[in-house]
Regions:
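Active-site core of glycosidic bond-cleaving carbohydrate-active enzymes
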Residues: 1-25, 97, 101-108, 135, ...
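Short amphipathic coiled-coil heptad-repeat segments
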Residues: 179-184
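Periplasmic/luminal catalytic loop of GT-C fold multi-pass membrane glycosyltransferases
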Residues: 76
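Acidic/His metal-coordination segments adjacent to aromatic residues that form catalytic metal sites
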Residues: 42-69, 124-141, 315-324
Length: 345
């Protein structure tokens, strides 16, 4: 959906957004309180029952124009992020008015599900590409909190423009940013924690993944020095993999998504979209040369050296187990368009 506006297909982008807005649940209030985890799945997912916090008003189902499908992913965050960028790029306030309830229902749903203790930090559940093997056990998570910070901040701005009350969204954005800086930013290391544990000693997971760094920067939770420090964490703590071939003018690099071991699908891959989003974060942090090197290294890796030249794939040939996987992968297409336009240009 990101790329539609870049190539002038604003109407096509709105068709996409309208189709999933029509999939947002609007007539199922949350009547079953937390916790509603599925015991048959060892409490790893919400039980699939209408009226639970997860499957209630605000939830966006997986198929266009279908409000009756339960799925375990929370793709609300990605959809709303794309929608907010569409508002930003087009300035179409009539469309903002049309989609206002979609946005506010989403924000209420996120708050109900992922910040029920109202501390300003959100749990994360199946809401990013890498989430298949991520689980935070109700912890306070950087990437989901950053997504919700940006959504509330922009909701406040949009509310003022269309005559709605901006106050609740301003307050929530301020609360999130304050909590992220006080509890998730590791001052002596210069980056955000992956998350803070909900139980026990409430320890910080200090080995953050790429998604922690780039989402926090992309959602504008960082000041300029924080952004620089966080990208230096990528330099020093995330594995760098050389990209080389006969005829290249110089050596390039790509990245693993984490430094975690052992290898597990979705949490320490070499994934094109993850590298591209990190490249965008480097551009946003004022490190354009390093961002360009990551961008070009990833393009060479997948679109030149890969088995399907010119294609936007999902996983790199440098991935230890999966190797090259999937073609025409939308995550990669969308974020590469943003990195080219908002980063390089």
């Amino acid at each position: 959906a990101y790329i539609g506006d870049f190539i002038g297909w604003h109407d096509r982008a709105r068709t996409h957004f309208d189709s999933y807005a029509a999939s947002q649940v609007t007539d199922v209030p949350a009547t079953i309180p937390h916790p509603t985890q599925d015991t048959a799945l060892h409490l790893a997912r919400s039980v699939k029952k209408w009226g639970t916090p997860h499957y209630s008003n605000g939830y966006i189902c997986r198929t266009p124009y279908r409000k009756d499908q339960m799925h375990h992913y929370d793709m609300n965050l990605c959809y709303i992020d794309e929608l907010l960028w569409h508002f930003n790029w087009t300035g179409d306030l009539d469309y903002v008015r049309k989609m206002w309830l979609v946005l506010t229902s989403h924000l209420a749903w996120e708050k109900l599900n992922y910040d029920p203790d109202n501390d300003g930090l959100y749990d994360a559940y199946c809401c990013i590409w890498a989430s298949d093997a991520l689980y935070y056990n109700s912890g306070a998570v950087t990437h989901s909190s950053a997504y919700n910070y940006r959504a509330n901040k922009l909701a406040a701005m949009l509310a003022e423009k269309i005559g709605e009350d901006a106050t609740p969204y301003e307050k929530e954005a301020d609360k999130i940013l304050k909590a992220m800086n006080e509890r998730l930013w590791i001052k002596d290391k210069g980056h955000w924690a992956e998350f803070q544990d909900f139980m026990g000693h409430k320890r910080l997971h200090e080995s953050a993944g790429l998604w922690t760094i780039y989402h926090a920067i992309d959602s504008e939770t960082a000041d300029p020095f924080q952004a620089y420090q966080a990208t230096r964490y990528v330099d020093t703590s995330i594995p760098h993999i050389p990209v080389f071939a006969d005829g290249l003018d110089r050596d390039y690099e790509t990245l693993s998504t984490t430094n975690w071991m052992p290898y597990v699908w979705s949490v320490n891959n070499v994934a094109f979209a993850e590298v591209m989003h990190t490249a965008l974060a480097f551009f946003q942090a004022g490190r354009g040369d390093d961002g360009f090197n990551l961008l070009k290294g990833s393009i060479l890796d997948g679109m030149y050296l890969g088995k399907s030249p010119g294609n936007f794939g999902q996983i790199s040939l440098y991935d230890a187990v999966r190797r090259e996987t999937y073609r025409d992968f939308a995550d990669q297409i969308g974020i590469t368009s943003r990195t080219l336009i908002q980063g390089l240009y």
